Amino acid sequence: MSSTKRQKNRVLVKLKKRKVRKDKIEKWAELALSALGLNNVELSVYITDDQEIRELNKTYRKKDKPTDVLSFPMGEEFGGYKILGDVVISQDTAERQARELGHSLEEEVKRLIVHGIVHLLGYDHEKGGEEEKKFRELENYVLSKLSKAL
């Protein structure tokens, strides 16, 4: 009889911009993955600037402008983990949005991490209709779980 060893999720964080602490980003991502019932997954989160995310947005989405968050799904297995993918966040855009929405940069980065993870799971709010509804419901569910856990 074989048993599957349950592993913790692995979150890798790279910071080009450093206004939000790495340990907080790791914790938020780990809590989000847990709220979604995901196990043995690896997620990368990269905090960058408008210039770099604009280049990524232009290359991968053919949109020559900065955006708040991009998600790059992987789905491969490596070292006992399913590599969920990469979430890339522009701290510059996150700062502007936080000011516009009247909350902290940390709150906005937390929201964007969750938003990016929901995209990695295959949901797409840009399709509108029922797909957008499912996306928003899942995003709000995870954000409420994070609020209760923090």
From Swiss-Prot:
Key words of the record: Cytoplasm, Endonuclease, Hydrolase, Metal-binding, Nuclease, Ribosome biogenesis, rRNA processing, Zinc
PROSITE patterns associated with the record: UPF0054
Keyword rRNA processing annotated: yes
Gene Ontology MF: a single term: metalloendopeptidase activity
EC number assigned by the record: 3.1.-.-
InterPro entries named in the record: MetalPrtase_cat_dom_sf_prd (IPR023091), YbeY (IPR002036), YbeY_CS (IPR020549)
Gene Ontology CC entries for this record: cytoplasm
Gene Ontology BP annotations: rRNA processing
Cofactor note: Binds 1 zinc ion.
Binding site for Zn(2+): 115, 119, 125
Listed cofactors: Zn(2+)
A matching Pfam family: YbeY
Localization of this protein: Cytoplasm
Entry's family note: Belongs to the endoribonuclease YbeY family.
Function (record text): Single strand-specific metallo-endoribonuclease involved in late-stage 70S ribosome quality control and in maturation of the 3' terminus of the 16S rRNA.
Name of the protein: Endoribonuclease YbeY
Source species of the chain: Aquifex aeolicus (strain VF5)
